[in-house]
UniProtKB/Swiss-Prot annotation:
It comes from Aromatoleum aromaticum (strain DSM 19018 / LMG 30748 / EbN1) (Azoarcus sp. (strain EbN1)). Coiled coil: none annotated. It catalyses: uridine(54) in tRNA + S-adenosyl-L-methionine = 5-methyluridine(54) in tRNA + S-adenosyl-L-homocysteine + H(+); uridine(341) in tmRNA + S-adenosyl-L-methionine = 5-methyluridine(341) in tmRNA + S-adenosyl-L-homocysteine + H(+). InterPro entries: MeTrfase_TrmA_AS (IPR030390), MeTrfase_TrmA_CS (IPR030391), SAM-dependent_MTases_sf (IPR029063), TrmA_MeTrfase (IPR011869), U5_MeTrfase_fam (IPR010280). Dual-specificity methyltransferase that catalyzes the formation of 5-methyluridine at position 54 (m5U54) in all tRNAs, and that of position 341 (m5U341) in tmRNA (transfer-mRNA). HAMAP family: RNA_methyltr_TrmA. This is tRNA/tmRNA (uracil-C(5))-methyltransferase. It comes from the Bacteria. One of its GO terms (molecular function) is tRNA binding. The gene is trmA.
Length: 368
């Protein structure tokens, strides 16, 4: 994680610059005025990781400037981190400094917090962990009231559980999400909640069935599923699929079929060019897809997935990379136009911008 330059007084102007760049980039596609969802200027980041810098008996959190990658910068406080992380950082450092067992060859510390106040800390070592470490770690976890995990090469010690439970309300509806250590979770919880709300508004009243690619732990699936008759969701990560199944059950979602497949594979399955054992319990003939939802990696949609998308009347696209989003929109321009747009400032004080587009078929929906 790079060291950001943080000045809350500059936040609004920095966001305005990013929005201007977004609008300029998508002007050739007649993008409507985007809805802008800002971040809180401080305490917005639910994930943080630090190298641990040892100097004699002293140990400190450290980050590195890309311009001087070998020179550590000691971190006394980290105001962009969520408040549970900020509160735990000095207490954890004190306990590490006081315990040779806990600090010896400690290489890195990772924090994962939730909007609902839970916190998980992973301590990563360059040595095997033994019973004495586990005893000291249990005392530390109890004192800090956190989930604590120890890692070293080919070793993982989970003292209680390796996940936290996120809880928040969306349009008055209480939601909960299991977030597993080491798997992808949204870094900016406040902005994520705004993304979910915007996505729901784009498809409210549409009905029909939804195909979702890259569903992760079900972040959007849980929010969107009640707005559709049926949902077919795909994801390749085993841990994310496990979390998604938990999250669907925990939120009483019963209209989602989930399969562990890549976008290439589901494209082939829908085109009936390949059969997959993983699809044996899914009757594709029952689905009447009205909408495709995608939240792909930075590389965007590959050519087969773009071809798949052309067959949908509505494409709801969340992107963490406006450049590949531009490329995909250009590839779809002959069949789809932009009907709605939003920008989500997941990463304040950086050049990165999350964005969302609603693409609809030119000339209206196809006849059923």
């Amino acid at each position: 994680m790079p060291l950001p330059a943080i000045d809350p007084a500059e936040y609004a102007s920095q966001l305005a610059d990013k929005v201007t760049q977004f609008k300029h980039a998508f002007t050739p596609f007649a993008v409507p005025e985007p809805t802008v969802f800002p971040s809180a200027p401080l305490h917005y980041r639910l994930r943080a990781e630090f190298r641990m810098w040892h100097d004699g008996e002293r140990i400190d959190y450290a980050m590195f400037d890309p311009a001087e990658p070998k020179q550590p910068i000691a971190i006394e406080q980290f105001d962009i981190a969520a408040e549970p992380i900020c509160a735990a950082m000095p207490r954890l450092r004190e306990r590490l400094r006081a315990s040779e067992t806990l600090k010896r060859r400690l290489f890195q510390v990772e924090f994962l917090a939730t909007l609902s106040g839970e916190l998980m800390i992973s301590l990563i070592y360059h040595r095997p962990l033994d019973e004495s470490w586990e005893a000291a770690a249990r005392e530390l976890a109890a004192e800090l009231n956190v989930q604590l995990i120890g890692r070293s090469r080919k070793q993982k010690i989970v003292l209680d559980r390796d996940w936290v439970l996120e809880r928040f309300a969306l349009d008055g509806r209480p939601l909960q999400y299991k977030q597993i250590e080491g798997s992808f979770t949204q870094p900016n919880g406040g902005v994520n909640r705004q993304m979910l709300g915007w996505a729901c508004e784009q498809v409210r009243g549409v009905g029909g069935d939804l195909l979702e690619l890259y569903c992760g732990n079900g972040n959007f699936t849980v929010a969107l599923a009640p707005l559709f008759d049926r949902v077919l969701a795909t994801e390749v990560s085993k841990t994310s699929v496990e979390a998604a199944h938990y999250n669907l059950a925990a939120n009483d979602i019963g209209n989602v079929a989930m399969v562990r497949m890549s976008s290439d594979e589901i494209s082939a399955a829908l085109a009936r060019t390949r059969e997959f054992r993983r699809m044996k319990d899914v009757d594709l003939d029952r689905y009447r897809f009205s909408t495709l939802f995608v939240d792909p990696p930075r590389s965007g949609l590959d050519a087969p997935t773009v071809e798949l998308a052309r067959g949908f009347d509505r494409i709801l696209y969340i992107s963490c990379n406006p450049q590949t989003l531009q490329e995909n929109v250009a590839a779809l321009q002959a069949t789809h136009g932009i009907a709605g747009a939003a920008v989500f400032d997941q990463f304040p004080y950086t050049r990165h911008l999350e964005c969302g587009l609603l693409l609809t078929r030119r000339g209206g929906p196809r006849a059923p």
